């Protein structure tokens, strides 16, 4: 609930860089039939409906809790959501953890040691930048994300390209914005139908929703969704 610091986000991103570069555009991932992609039939059949189920609740109850323009972003995305999912599947692909929230990250006592990720049950073959959009957009306080998101993205992009991978900055920025829009569906799930269970769960749901929508506004994410 407190959120990650910029230093913690850097450490997590450095670990993700190793994962992403190892599997970047690796065709052997396509042979893993159990490893989903963003447009897997199960996702196409459920995720847009989850998004739309939360929209009336967002409009009725959250307008004064989010940055100005957040509800307009949600409305604009509504008829474009399936097209967004198609674009997310276009690549470049790698092995993505796909659930990079703080609960799934262990930080070492010695900062020189790498962090460890757990809970790979949602891993998929998709753009690596999606892991950054999820981490920054949902696990950092809005002010921290606002101040550091571009530097964190440039850190990841620089290390990716330094490894010999060709990936333009403009594409990276576009793909980050698209991913930030996609993860609004998680907030819609929380406010639309998900039982948070207890006080901590409710606090986490509130933090997730405000952070992810405020981040989408801060980075002009909707500009990535014509």
What does each of the following model-derived ranges do?
Residues 178, 182-226:
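ATP/Mg2+ or Mg2+-diphosphate-binding catalytic cores
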Residues 99, 119:
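Conserved catalytic-loop position in the HRD/HxD motif
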